[in-house]
Design a protein with these regions (language model features):
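Sec-dependent N-terminal signal peptides of Gram-positive bacterial secreted proteins and lipoproteins
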Residues: 2-25, 327
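Short amphipathic beta-strand/extended segments with alternating polar/hydrophobic composition
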Residues: 13, 47-49, 210
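Active-site-adjacent loops and short helices of periplasmic peptidoglycan-processing enzymes
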Residues: 20-184
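Domain-terminus/edge residues, biased toward the C-terminal soluble/receptor-binding domains
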Residues: 145-146, 161-327
């Protein structure tokens, strides 16, 4: 249904929002920035400063992983450069000049968050980290994630003359949706990120075991995929794909505490799962804090949302309302 509204558009949306808010109270989160995406209808169900540019640490690695899966074979042998071997902790300890199987590096990157694995993967596929970063940003752009700018494959903080390494909670949700469900390599991505333990033996006979740090896999029965992250700038971060009660959702939590608040992200994640599964209708409105002028045209074309019907994500990003700010 299409309706036309004039300058009272904000008041109209507020009225609708308040009536719907009564059904499901919004969660109070620790995260500075957060988003919850209804992945079946491409609608943001919850947002908190979700369009703010934020450092996102190792959650970057979900895009590194899917781009690697789409542009290489798991059997590829990856030769380690001096730069790859010299990456800071957390790292596997790759040896310069040695070659490792792509599959082993992907599991090391996604389960243990090893920075040297991510760097070696990037150099193997892109030729250089700079060119691989261009591949990441091109993929983000193809997904409509225009507020994402990645400079490193492992999420370590960096900046150039254009900007700093960042994304937004909204963009990160959309990236996870693509990784978990929409890519032709989503099945492989899910398999890697759902694995609790992975072991391999390198060519020197050293046995390695990787353990998955995504606690939501064991603390809930609905986690399809997830990735943690931390830097001193980004704080604790988390992105996940969730499927519960026939509903698919993606969540992103950025700036979710600093030491000693490592568990804040798990608390916030569970709150968003509860909120998302108890919300009967998906909805999206104008976010509080946006300037009135953004919606102050003499005539605006607005598509109303009804359950189980599609609405464009780009439209929803324009009309996103954080209801609790109106109380």
């Amino acid at each position: 249904m299409i309706i036309f509204l004039g300058k009272r558009i904000l008041v109209s949306f507020m009225t609708i929002a308040i009536s719907m808010a009564a059904a499901t109270a919004e969660p109070g989160l620790h995260a500075k920035s957060a988003a919850l995406l209804d992945a079946d209808n491409d609608v943001i169900m919850y947002s908190k400063s979700a369009n703010d540019s934020m450092a996102n640490a190792s959650t970057t690695k979900i895009l590194t992983c899917i781009v690697a899966l789409e542009n290489s074979s798991l059997d590829d042998m990856v030769r380690v450069s001096e730069k790859s071997a010299g990456q800071p902790q957390v790292k596997l300890g790759l040896v310069e000049g040695e070659s490792y199987k792509m599959q082993d590096l992907l599991y090391g990157m996604m389960l243990e968050s090893y920075n040297d694995c991510a760097y070696a993967i990037a150099e193997h596929i892109g030729g250089s980290v700079e060119d691989f970063s261009d591949m990441l940003n091109l993929k983000a752009n193809e997904l409509g994630c225009y507020n994402t700018y990645f400079l490193t494959p492992n999420g370590l903080d960096d900046e150039d003359e254009i900007s700093f390494h960042h994304t937004t909670a909204n963009d990160l949700c959309n990236i996870m949706k693509y990784c978990a469900w929409d890519s032709q390599k989503s099945a492989e991505f899910q398999k890697i990120t759902q694995t609790m333990e992975y072991g391999f033996t390198d060519k020197n006979g050293n046995n390695m075991t990787f353990t998955n740090h995504n606690k939501l896999l064991t603390q809930t029965d609905c986690c399809v995929s997830g990735k943690t992250g931390y830097t001193s700038k980004a704080g604790y971060c988390y992105v996940a794909a969730i499927e519960k009660d026939g509903k698919r959702m993606c969540m992103a939590l950025l700036g979710c505490g600093w030491p000693d608040n490592k568990n804040y992200k798990w608390e916030d994640a569970k709150k968003l799962i509860k909120y998302g599964t108890s919300t009967k209708e998906s909805f999206s409105f104008i976010e509080a804090g946006n300037s009135k002028e953004n919606a102050d045209a003499d005539t605006e074309e607005v598509t109303t949302y009804e359950p189980d019907k599609k609405i464009s994500q780009k439209f929803c990003e324009t009309f996103t309302l954080n209801i609790n700010k109106f109380y």
